[in-house]
């Protein structure tokens, strides 16, 4: 045994052709060496084949591994480690075998990963169908209660916007009209005051002034009096115009206030019918003939009745 192992280590004999040297060994050693040599010869013959063939062989050999195949793999690895520095063919065989093992592992993992994806896709395909079968009415309208609430809120906001726009527009018109009326009144008053303050007659002594100079002064005073009369007339017109504008604005404001009060009263009646609130009730007193407005709750009236 020792001589045979020494000669085997020292001589580079092809193990594929040296099957007769191991005839005198024990049965277990003979079986192990036979399997090692068979595998090595098979891999050496595959060196000349392309890499794609090796990959195909590896794929075909990815069946459930038996204990004998595992024993052969371990024996091949030990034989390569003991045989000294391997050549380029042996290196290529080892690399191909490692690639085959990696490919088999990747194929196994990718197979399970594909199964998971298929299951997930099947679940995702079943979920919308189940949702569609359970909720056929849901077409994107949402909850009808929420929709009605949103519509009511939108209508209320539109009404508020309309009332606010009307109030702002009426307020602007009323403000401009009131300012113009005040300006007319103030201007008319000032013109009337100026026309009465400015003196119209000549205050010069006629004995100290020549006759022609006196005539000229009288003409100027007459022209000044005419201008002052015009100022008085303009002032009175402006006062009248300011009073008319102010009275019109006052009437318009009263009319709008009455309309607003009626609208609010009507809305309060509607809200009282819907939700219950305070209502105005006219009642006559037994002692006096006057009418009194009293606020009575609708709920209290219902309880009393």
From Swiss-Prot:
Modified residues (Phosphoserine): 11
GO molecular function: transmembrane transporter binding
Membrane topology: Multi-pass membrane protein
Subcellular location: Lysosome membrane; Cytoplasmic vesicle, Autophagosome membrane
One GO cellular component, as annotated: cytoplasmic vesicle
Polar residues biased stretches: 122-132
Main location as per UniProt: membrane
Region (Disordered): 122-143
Keyword terms: Autophagy, Cytoplasmic vesicle, Lysosome, Membrane, Phosphoprotein, Transmembrane, Transmembrane helix
Gene Ontology terms describing biological process: general adaptation syndrome, behavioral process; macroautophagy
Keyword Iron annotated: no
Transmembrane region(s): 178-198, 232-252
Family statement: Belongs to the TMEM74 family.
Known role: Plays an essential role in autophagy. TMEM74-induced autophagy may involve PI3K signal transduction.
Name of the protein in its database record: Transmembrane protein 74
Native species: Mus musculus
